[in-house]
């Protein structure tokens, strides 16, 4: 059973990226201009390799992950989806607190800790987002966000077998890294941790169903469309140091 759970988590990584939660599925506006000093141009020196892996991952997504996301969409109502999203978000809040601590942003570190404590207790294990109602909003941070905070540019765009789309900097946001530095994971059973990871990937994939379906059916080049969307939305979600300038790729 544990092997099946692990395989499910791995196979749920193709399109399911937390970065995509920033995409507006209604208007398909992928302009990441909110971060004016970010790296808005994609650096893709390995495009030939990336396209081959993208095609491979797309087939597996069509066979495995997309059906799971569609099933989740069909068998759960909006209330259940909201509870699942709130619960998963709460599990990853300690990870956000750790990364804010690494960024020396102690105000947001403390707020993240309070958010976790409030939602875990008053929110019944995180099923309800009580903290947002008292001004403690969700603001997910990853180790890639922390690296960006210290001026690390995204680097080359990469599409890895099974892992999916990422870049040199955000490879640190793999399942293994986020799993390792989330303090909550050290106090819970392994099967629980794996289950949370699998559920989070399925819900992430559900969120981007309108986007991915639209691109696959209408885009003349789905690879470019998805690459642009992932890159720009990720750049819009990180905060670079003041006066940061994206380095120009070497020819």
UniProtKB/Swiss-Prot annotation:
The keyword Endoplasmic reticulum does not apply. Residues 1-18 form the signal peptide. GO terms for biological process: intermembrane phospholipid transfer. Keywords: Signal. GO terms for cellular component: membrane. Belongs to the MlaA family. PANTHER family: INTERMEMBRANE PHOSPHOLIPID TRANSPORT SYSTEM LIPOPROTEIN MLAA, LIPOPROTEIN VACJ-RELATED. This is Uncharacterized protein RT0044. It comes from Rickettsia typhi (strain ATCC VR-144 / Wilmington).
């Amino acid at each position: 059973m544990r092997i099946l759970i692990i395989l499910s988590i791995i196979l749920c990584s193709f399109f399911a990226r937390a970065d995509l939660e920033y995409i507006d599925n209604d208007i398909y506006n992928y302009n990441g201009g909110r971060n004016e000093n970010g790296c808005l141009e994609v650096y893709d020196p390995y495009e030939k390799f990336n396209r081959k892996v993208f095609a491979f991952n797309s087939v597996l997504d069509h066979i495995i992950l997309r059906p799971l996301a569609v099933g989740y969409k069909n068998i759960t109502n909006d209330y259940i989806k909201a509870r699942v999203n709130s619960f998963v978000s709460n599990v990853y809040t300690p990870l956000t607190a750790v990364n804010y601590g690494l960024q020396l942003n102690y105000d947001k570190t403390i707020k993240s800790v309070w958010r976790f404590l409030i939602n875990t207790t008053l929110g019944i294990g995180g099923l309800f987002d009580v903290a947002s109602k008292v001004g403690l909003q969700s603001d997910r941070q990853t180790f890639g966000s922390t690296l960006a905070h210290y001026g690390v540019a995204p680097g080359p765009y990469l599409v890895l077998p099974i892992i999916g789309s990422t870049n040199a900097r955000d490879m640190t946001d793999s399942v293994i890294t986020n799993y390792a530095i989330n303090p909550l994971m050290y106090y819970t059973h392994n099967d629980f941790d794996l289950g949370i990871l699998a559920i989070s990937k399925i819900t992430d994939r559900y969120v981007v169903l309108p986007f991915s379906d639209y691109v696959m059916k209408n885009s003349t080049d789905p690879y470019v469309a998805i690459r642009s969307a992932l890159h720009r939305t990720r750049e819009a979600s990180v905060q670079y140091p003041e006066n940061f300038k994206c380095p120009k790729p070497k020819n």
